[in-house]
């Protein structure tokens, strides 16, 4: 008997939410960046200041944090935003970067609260999927996998 797994949207959304609210904020601080710095896709992730022997560990930590920030920004920039049915990039930017409240984003993109909650969850799931690729590109594979899996509801159909 085989078990088919699929992403659990609720738990994945919660994992992405925790990561982008807490870990992302910490990496921004460690890299010397601010949310206002990441509106430009040309961000290079390099820490500011001059390196010194006494501060080598801090420089390395800041450089790594910059790479994590770049991976997060690239992931958000790569999320779907090509039509009104998938405004995922806009939702992620407005909520996690600009700090807008859910109801304001819902009004901005023309969705009811219920529709918005679903779209936000789908945006979080897309972020979790795409983050796996961008972690490799930016050499931060030790960052957590945000995809939380569950047994597929209809897996009996596919069992051996």
For every predicted segment, state its role.
Residues 1-80, 133-160:
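N-terminal interaction/assembly modules
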Residues 98-115:
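Helix-turn-helix DNA-binding module
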Residues 42-50, 111-114, 122-123:
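C-terminal low-complexity, acidic/polar tails when present
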Residues 68-72, 87-88, 119:
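Amphipathic alpha-helical interface surfaces
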Residues 82-100:
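Short amphipathic alpha helix immediately N-terminal
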Residues 116-134:
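DNA major-groove recognition helices of helix-turn-helix
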Residues 77, 93-97, 128:
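Short, locally clustered residues in the helix-turn-helix/winged-helix DNA-binding domain
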Residues 79-83, 111:
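Short acidic, glycine/proline-enriched loop segments that cap or flank alpha-helices
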């Amino acid at each position: 008997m085989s078990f088919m797994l699929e992403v659990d949207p609720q738990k994945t959304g919660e994992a992405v939410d925790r990561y982008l609210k807490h870990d992302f904020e910490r990496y921004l601080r460690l890299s010397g960046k601010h949310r206002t710095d990441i509106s430009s896709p040309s961000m290079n992730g390099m820490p500011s200041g001059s390196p010194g022997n006494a501060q080598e560990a801090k420089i390395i930590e800041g450089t790594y944090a910059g790479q994590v920030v770049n991976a997060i920004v690239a992931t958000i920039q790569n999320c779907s935003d090509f039509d009104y049915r998938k405004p995922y990039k806009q939702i992620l930017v407005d909520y996690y970067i600009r700090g807008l409240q859910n109801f304001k984003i819902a009004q901005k993109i023309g969705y009811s609260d219920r529709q918005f909650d679903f779209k936000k969850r789908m945006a979080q799931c897309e972020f979790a999927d795409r983050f796996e690729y961008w972690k490799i590109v930016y050499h931060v594979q030790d960052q957590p996998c945000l995809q939380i899996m569950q047994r597929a509801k209809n897996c009996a159909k596919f069992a051996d």
